[in-house]
Amino acid sequence: MAEKILVIGAHPDDVDFASAGIMSRWAKEGKEIYYLICTNGDKGGTQNNHTPAQLVEIRKAEQRAAADIVGVKEVIYLGRKDGELMPDMGLREDLVRVIRQVKPDKVFSFDPANQSFDGFHLFHPDHRAVAISVFDAIYPAAKNRLYFPQLLVGGLEPHKVEELYFYGTKEPNIWFDIS
C-alpha cells in the first residue's frame, strides 16, 4: 500500500508555497498526496475587484490546477471563511475527521511554535490557528476514540499519524532534496 501524506494549510496556495517541490517528487515516487485547505479563499489578495464568491471559485480553480501539476490525489476543503479561523474544538474536530478519513502516515502543516512577528505571512492569524489545531488534532485526538466519539458512528476509527513535519518555521531542522 502506498504511503499517504496529508499537507494542511489555511488558504489555497499555502500548501504549494510550503511543500510543492517535495510533494511533487514523492507523488512521482508513488506516494499518495492529499491537500487539506481550511478556508475557502474568499478574502485572498488585497488588490482585486472580485466579489468573495468569485474569489472562492478562482482560488479553487487555481489550487486544483496547482495540485494537478504536483500530482496530488485529492484536494479537500473545509470551506471556512478567510480570516475567521480559530483554534477551537470545531476546527479540531474537522481536522480529526479528515485525518481519520485519509489515514496519513505523514502530516505537514504550519509550525505552532512560530509565534514571533518575523513576517506577515508566518504570523497570519489563520496560519497560527491551523498550526495549533493540527498539532492538537494529531495528539491526542485523532488516535483516541474518546475524542469526538460521534465520528465513530460514521465509521471513522482512530488513526495514529507516524510523522509530523512543520513548515513556515523559524528554526528548520530538516531539508528534503527536490532536485
Regions from the PLM with identified roles:
Residues 1-103:
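Active-site rim/loop-helix segments in enzyme catalytic domains that contact anionic ligands
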Residues 1-6, 89-179:
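Metal-dependent de-N-acetylase/amidase catalytic core
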